[in-house]
Structure formats: structure tokens, C-alpha cells
Amino acid sequence: MQGVRITILWCIVLATIYAEEGPSTPRDDDPVIQKVRGLRNAGMKANDERMFKDAIEKLRHAISLLHNRVFGEERAAIKDPTVISQDAALYAQILNDYGSVLIRTKQYDEAIEVLEDSVAMIEKIYGDSHPSLGLSLRSLADAYMEKKAFKSAIKRYKTLRKHVKKGLGMTHEAYIEASLKIAEGYKKLNKKDTSRKVLKDTLKAQGGEINGLTIGIAELYMELSSAHVEVGEIDDALRAAETASAIFLQREGKDTMAYAFSLNALAGVKMQQKKVDEAIDLLDRAHNIAVSIYGENDRITLASAKTLQDVKDHKMNLLAAKDEL
């Protein structure tokens, strides 16, 4: 769910990049550029339809055509510096698209190589303040994360966060999402104290009045609750879990899986407090939401039913043990 929101956010950023291209120019009528854009659009459509082999083939063709214009024999025929810059920018953009498809097909090494090139080209063309740099950095960091190269992923997410901070500020959802990824990376490296510090510092950076409707804030509290539980800070975990649940309720609504997941997390804290009845009530509410959305036999619903039953069984065992005393 979080991953979907991140994707939507960066799609908006990408739309901004397209909008900056401005009005039609003679270059737009160039047959090579038209063919490249057609291949790019067809490739991304195939990607959306999970036809990855077709998507890769079309994007590789587009890259090959543009590579010849940017680096090959056709470069000598192009004299206008603006056109040269636009060609290079389009090349970097399609490299990013191609890298994203490679990530989806788990071809991480090639994805990283392609996306490193995309980042380098954008920095050379625009410097470190262009929106398209953030898009490529995010894709590159994601590729490292998927490859389980967590140190490299953290480094790139930090660069991305610095880029976002400079352009959008620390209260923007993109800054929060990058911070969540950094914290996740440290958690994967078993650096739990560092992960928790990243989460707390990000929350502190939001200032005195936190906007709970900002995407990422509820998720931030949820992760912070989990981090507190891991080190036995149960009171802090409860406060964070309650805040996350309240925000999800306000932001997503009472009949959503986001809210249901927050109830599950809150139930976990209640179990740490040995408040089993309260945990059962929360899990029952979460399960009913899942049933209303997916029905009785969905994988998610069956999992929530099992969790609920396990806790009920735990309660019965506690009662039985008490009766034996």
C-alpha cells in the first residue's frame, strides 16, 4: 500500500517534468523523436499490462535510436545546443523508464547500471535541482534496495532526501517517504537504534503542528511504534500506534484496509501490555473490515481470522492456567 502511494507521488512529479517541456517545437516534428516517443509510450503501456518482454524490447529500441543521436553519428548533424540538451534529457528519461521495468523483472544489476547513467546525465544537464533527478534517484535507490544492497540504497535515498529537502522542504510527503526508506534500510542492516533515530528525527522535523493528512505521517508513526516495541519502550509504542490509527481513520476512512492494518498494529502493542481482551476487540474490528472488503475466503481475510483465533486461544490458555492454580 505504501509502495503504491510512493509510485503515485512520483508519477505526479513525472507529470510535472512533462509539463515543463513547454509548447510544440520543430524538434517535436522530427521523425526520429516521434518514433522514440512512440516506442517509449508503447513500452510503458506494455509495462502497465505486465507484458515485460515487449516493454523491454520497445524501450531498448528507443534507447538505441536516441543513443545514436546523443553519442553516435547523428550527433554531428545537430547544431542547436537546445536540441542537443533536449535529446540528452529525453535519453535520461527513457533510461529511467527502462530501469524501472528492469526492477519489476528483477534484473537488478542491469537496472542499477542503467539508472546510474540516468542520474549522471541529469546531473550533468540540469545540475542537482531538477525534478527528474529525484525520479531517477528514487528508482536507483529502489533497485539497490531490491538487490538487498542496503548500504548503497541508504546512500541513494539520503541523496534523494537532500534533493527533496532543497526543493520541497522537510514537511513534504516525498521527504517523509525517503526517510521511511532510509529507516527501513537501517532496519535491514540490523541497526535498529539508527533506524529508530531516523524515524524520530523525521517526526521532529515536521515541526510543532504535524499535518496528519500528509501521506507518510501515519506510516511514520506506525513504523515508530514497531521500533519502540523492539526495544521494550511499550508506552511510547502505544502512543505512536494510537496516533497512527487515528490518522489512518481520518485520512482513509473506517472501512479501509489501511485503518484495519493500524488496528492490527495497535493490537500487537496491547498484547505486549498483556491486555488480551483489548487486543481481541481490535483484531475483531480489523477482521470485520477485511471481510467487508474481500469476503470470507480471501488470503488476507483468512490470515486475519487465524491471527484473531490464535489470540483467542491464547486467552483460553491463560484462563485454563489460572484455573489450575
From Swiss-Prot:
Q: Which UniProt keywords apply?
A: Host cytoplasm, Host nucleus, Repeat, Secreted, Signal, TPR repeat, Virulence
One Pfam family here:
TPR_12
The answer to keyword Secreted applying to this record is yes
Provide the residue intervals of the TPR repeats. 37-75, 92-125, 134-167, 218-251, 260-293
Q: The motif RxLR-dEER: which residues?
A: 37-75
The record's annotation in InterPro entries points to:
TPR-like_helical_dom_sf (IPR011990), TPR_rpt (IPR019734)
UniProt induction comment: Expression is up-regulated during plant colonization, 3 days after infection.
Q: Which residues form a coiled coil?
A: none
GO cellular component, as recorded: extracellular region; host cell cytoplasm; host cell nucleolus
Signal peptide as annotated in the record: 1-19
Task: State where the protein is found.
Answer: Secreted; Host cytoplasm; Host nucleus; Host nucleus, Host nucleolus
Q: What functional role does this protein have?
A: Secreted effector that suppresses pattern-triggered immunity (PTI) in plant host.
Family the UniProt entry places it in = Belongs to the RxLR effector family.
Q: What domain comment accompanies this record?
A: The RxLR-dEER motif acts to carry the protein into the host cell cytoplasm through binding to cell surface phosphatidylinositol-3-phosphate.
The protein's name in its UniProt record? Secreted RxLR effector protein RXLR-C07
Organism of derivation? Plasmopara halstedii (Downy mildew of sunflower)
Q: Which gene encodes it?
A: RXLR-C07
